UniProtKB/Swiss-Prot annotation:
This is Meiotic recombination protein dmc1. Keywords: ATP-binding, Cell cycle, DNA recombination, DNA-binding, Magnesium, Meiosis, Nucleotide-binding, Nucleus. InterPro entries: AAA+_ATPase, Dmc1, DNA_recomb/repair_Rad51_C, DNA_recomb/repair_RecA-like, DNA_repair_Rad51/TF_NusA_a-hlx, P-loop_NTPase, RecA_ATP-bd, RecA_monomer-monomer_interface. It is found in: Nucleus. Gene3D superfamilies: 5' to 3' exonuclease, C-terminal subdomain, P-loop containing nucleotide triphosphate hydrolases. It comes from the Eukaryota. SsDNA binds at residues 223, 226, 229, 235, 304. SMART domains: AAA.
Length: 332
């Protein structure tokens, strides 16, 4: 596979480099501090609260006001017409899951500029879908790809290069080049996980070829670091900050954010005779942050079933798929 061309058209380069603020009187010393804090674009400054910016060492209230004013000149906070939003939505693209049936219920695949969450019990295909997307994201657009690189945050130690090789072979992609286009970080606690997400903002700003960010899984480390009801409030606050950052990244750099999530028993569902007695971890904070939510469960034999639980533009629907040596695929 050849190297990807730098994203230099309107579809991909939708952000302004933070160094453009020098034209509005912001010094390079302050810009370096912003980059170290993970704010690498003018849009990033615009999305950041004054409270967050004041936490950066050496930033006074007057300096933050000047910074916000400069960013506002470049990114005015105006209302847009529905027609303008419709035009902006044309920048959104989808990445194939490897299954046409699954792509169908998702409206084409995993969308950019939003968070897609898949949840389910073990052996349903969450990690296998993550590996499949690592390869399909690199495919040409006419094959359901996004022609770009992938960032993968592994919180459970389940990333396997051998799976990338097998999936690349299925799609006719050079395995070595496919692996070169994937960067992986292994997080061991929730603070490190947030650190990596912040660092990716800098990486995406410097290299406009990234199209997909995967976190597998989003809640695993939070469940370890925060245990018991006494720490639940703090956990949800930290989770909310992380998800807000992921949403900012997805819109700032027009990338697809794909997160896997674990499930927990739901005793209330059993009492109500509900068909599914499992619910995703993370509560309402997780539910509100994810634009698209997909439930994966075991079906008959080797089949798996995906149910679209929540989507802003697609109705609830189900489909079957299988896990093959070449990744997620349709039932034959």
């Amino acid at each position: 596979m050849e190297e990807f061309a730098e994203g230099n058209d309107d579809e991909q380069m939708i952000f302004s480099d933070i160094e453009d603020l020098t034209a509005h009187g912001i010094g390079m010393t302050d810009i370096i501090k912003l980059k170290q804090a993970g704010v690498c674009t003018v849009q990033g400054v615009h999305m950041s609260t004054k409270r967050f910016l004041l936490k950066i060492k050496g930033f006074s209230e007057a300096k933050v006001d000047k910074l916000k004013e400069a960013a506002s000149k470049m990114c005015p906070a105006n209302f847009s017409t529905a027609m303008e939003i419709s035009q902006n939505r044309k920048k959104v693209w989808s990445i194939s899951t490897g299954s046409e049936a699954l792509n169908g219920i998702l409206g084409g695949g995993i969308q950019s500029m939003s968070i897609t969450e898949v949840f389910g019990e073990f052996r349903c295909g969450k990690t296998q879908m993550s590996h499949t997307l690592c390869v399909t994201a690199q495919l040409p657009r006419d094959m359901g790809g996004a022609e770009g690189k992938v960032a993968f945050i592994d919180t459970e130690g389940t990333f396997r290069p051998d799976r990338i090789k097998a999936i690349a072979e299925r799609f006719g992609v050079d395995a070595d080049q496919a692996m070169e286009n994937i960067i992986v970080s292994r997080a061991y606690n929730s603070e490190q996980q947030m650190e990596y997400i912040t660092k990716l903002g800098t990486i995406f700003a410097e290299d406009g070829q990234y199209r997909l960010l995967i976190v597998d899984s989003i809640m695993a480390l939070f469940r370890v670091d925060y245990s018991g009801r006494g720490e639940l409030s703090e956990r949800q606050q930290k989770l909310n900050i992380m998800l807000a950052r992921l949403n900012h990244i997805s819109e700032e750099f027009n990338v697809a954010v794909f997160v896997t999530n674990q499930v927990q028993a739901d005793p209330g569902a059993a009492m109500m005779f509900a068909s599914n007695d499992r619910k995703p971890v993370g509560g309402h904070v997780m539910a509100h942050a994810s634009a698209t939510r997909l439930l994966l469960r075991k079906g008959r034999g080797e089949e798996r079933v995906a149910k679209l639980n929540d989507s802003p533009d697609m109705p609830e629907a189900e489909c079957s798929y299988v896990i093959t040596p070449g990744g997620i695929a349709d039932v034959s």
